[in-house]
């Protein structure tokens, strides 16, 4: 059937089959994220996407998509204990927001809650300035 997609093609479009979370203290966050990124790239991981979402409305943290030396896609999320707790606690409202079966009222309330949860997260000093690759 022409609508079928090969397994390899479908797998190539999935970026979070292997998802890891690295949690750092607020005090160490802005140092640890670049150190971890440097260690990964030195080991042969290729950065496909680097997103610093600190200060955003719906997610607090750094999200990275990597390709391992063996060709495996990996997602790595960098969080503080608080940002990780909020991410976990707000997952249900995230699912409501992305579900096409959710009513407009449900999406509106889920959006309001998500913004409120994320607004309460303390942004570690220097976190908004983290980027990759590091400027020379």
Regions found by a protein language model. Give the residues of each.
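Active-site-proximal segment of RNA-dependent polymerases
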Residues: 1-2
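Long beta-strand-rich cores associated with HINT superfamily self-processing modules
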Residues: 5-136
């Amino acid at each position: 059937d022409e609508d079928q997609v090969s397994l390899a093609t479908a797998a190539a479009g999935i970026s979070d089959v292997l998802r890891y979370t690295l949690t750092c203290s607020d005090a160490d966050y802005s140092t640890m994220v670049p150190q971890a990124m440097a260690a990964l790239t030195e080991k042969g991981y290729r950065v496909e996407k680097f997103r610093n979402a600190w200060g955003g409305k719906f997610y607090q943290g750094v999200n990275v998509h990597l390709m391992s030396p063996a060709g495996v896609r990996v997602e790595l999320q960098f969080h503080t204990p608080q940002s990780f707790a909020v991410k976990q606690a707000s997952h249900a409202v995230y699912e409501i927001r992305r579900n096409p079966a959710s009513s407009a009222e449900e999406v509106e309330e889920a959006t309001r809650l998500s913004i409120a949860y994320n607004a309460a997260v303390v942004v570690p000093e220097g976190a908004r300035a983290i980027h990759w690759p590091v400027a020379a």
